[in-house]
């Protein structure tokens, strides 16, 4: 069972720096794939990425919450054009690269959201999306 990066990810990249098997890839193009993604076939479930994420966006696959209760002020990102996600968020990753996420929104304190769609989206990134080619 792999770890999953959810839509709470704001493209920081700290997780990628600590992964011992280099299975974490930044989403590109960011308009379509706004998070970082973990290859479920390569992830060894070491958990090194979890404490590194400043957005607390990483969960074990079987622990991704379907009823995540926001503490307030955290953001969710979605592919550009997703209804209700119309705020831009500028993020600088650990390498100093600036990413502009064009489809985000701030969660209200106590708001409950389902983060489980990230499980399939994470897998799709490596099957249908760019996967490791995004590193080129």
Language-model-detected regions and their locations in the chain:
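Ferredoxin-like iron-sulfur electron-transfer modules
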Residues: 1-12, 22-45, 60-69, 133-136
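A structural motif detector for beta-strand N-caps
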Residues: 18-19, 23, 52-53
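Flanking helices and flexible, charged tails adjoining ferredoxin-like Fe-S electron-transfer domains
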Residues: 41-42, 48-136
């Amino acid at each position: 069972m792999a770890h999953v990066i959810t839509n709470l990810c704001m493209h920081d990249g700290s997780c990628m720096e600590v992964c011992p098997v280099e299975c974490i890839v930044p989403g590109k193009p960011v308009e379509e794939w706004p998070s970082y993604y973990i290859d479920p076939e390569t992830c060894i479930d070491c958990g090194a990425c979890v404490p590194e994420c400043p957005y607390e966006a990483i969960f074990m696959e079987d622990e991704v919450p379907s009823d995540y209760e926001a503490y307030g002020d955290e953001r969710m990102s979605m592919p550009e054009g997703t209804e209700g996600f119309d705020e831009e968020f500028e993020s600088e990753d650990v390498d100093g690269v600036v990413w502009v996420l064009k489809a985000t929104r701030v969660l209200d304190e106590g708001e409950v959201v389902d983060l489980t769609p990230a499980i399939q989206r994470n897998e799709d990134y490596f099957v249908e999306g760019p996967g490791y080619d995004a590193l080129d």
